[in-house]
């Protein structure tokens, strides 16, 4: 039985990953953004929320379903907040290419073919829906959890 911290891919040596991650494992990828959230919250709010929820999911169901947490993707599509100092945003074409590259690298470097994306930023939703369909062609089974959709009434 592993704790949540030991199921964080970025904290393991390559030899540990090689011996632990299997074809049936589920890789959990938190995604956020670096953008304004008003004068009172940090720019990385979406990252913190997505990473914390992913950590809780892995802590709760990691052993039972062989879940592994990947490092957070901190930059997304945030052009609507470009006016605010500190906002980092990719273009649609760069974000799409970045997501495809992540998918290809996961397939190249790990045996797991199951990916859960935990998206903490509403601006990423459209591009994720489009590109994850393409990423299935890489042999990945992908589910995306959009936190904003969960909080809608």
Task: Cite the ranges covered by each PLM segment.
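Short catalytic helix/loop segments, enriched in acidic residues and glycine
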Residues: 46-59
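Active-site histidine-anchored catalytic micro-motif
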Residues: 75-153
């Amino acid at each position: 039985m592993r704790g949540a911290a030991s199921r964080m891919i970025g904290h393991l040596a390559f030899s540990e990953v090689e011996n632990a991650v299997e074809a049936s494992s589920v890789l959990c990828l938190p995604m956020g953004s670096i953008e304004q959230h008003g004068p009172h919250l940090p720019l990385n709010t979406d990252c913190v929320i997505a990473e914390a929820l992913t950590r809780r999911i892995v802590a709760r169901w990691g052993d039972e379903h062989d879940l592994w947490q990947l490092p957070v993707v901190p930059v997304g599509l945030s052009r609507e907040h470009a006016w605010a100092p500190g906002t980092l945003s990719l273009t649609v074409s760069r974000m799409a290419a970045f997501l495809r590259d992540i998918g290809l690298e996961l397939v190249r470097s790990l045996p797991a073919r199951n990916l859960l994306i935990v998206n903490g930023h509403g601006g990423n939703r459209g591009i994720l829906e489009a590109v994850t369909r393409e990423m299935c062609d890489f042999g990945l089974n992908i589910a995306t959890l959009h936190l904003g959709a969960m909080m809608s009434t």
